[in-house]
């Protein structure tokens, strides 16, 4: 109703009702930002370059997707509460994630373990201050996700010569492998459970692929067919928010709070 009201106030009754029926919003981003809908802007989608030469010898694709503004709102709320969600959501400027499962995970038990999964997440922001704050927020929450979390200061020092000017890197060791968090300008890149050398190669490839101009892609087609997708009822498919949080839950993210996020994503608005 708030979306309809905003369009009505800006463009009149016809635009709010008949107009939105003729050109309905295509994403929650447009509903959250009715002015962007009115201007016919499209949401930013970071570019995912060809990572296959780096990962195919060790991993098979497990999941891939965008991290939209509503997804970010829920993640920020899980990580830092209402204040974090309120502060970070307007500064969001796109995001994507990719997860792979180790080819060495052969048995059902090995494949069911989160130790078989590695994940990277690219988060784009409208300003450098928000990017830096989100990187710190993410780092602060790692202790709730992993046991045995320790800063790897030696690895951080060894990376200093390879970082571009202005970039900052945090490295941690965990019970499920290294975590590398890099902030470069308005971008935050997180790699979890990849070996450090591979994480840094992925970081360089993906961050270098991002342009400085406005991105014009509205969506990307899924390149991975998930188990059971052929049998799924399209009418019963959950929104991206619920799917992303369920996926992150399966990977171990925010084990203490993720059920609350799932409940919030699926509850009536």
Specify the residue positions occupied by each region the protein language model found.
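Soluble, non-membrane globular domain cores that form compact, hydrophobic packing
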Residues: 1-119, 124-269
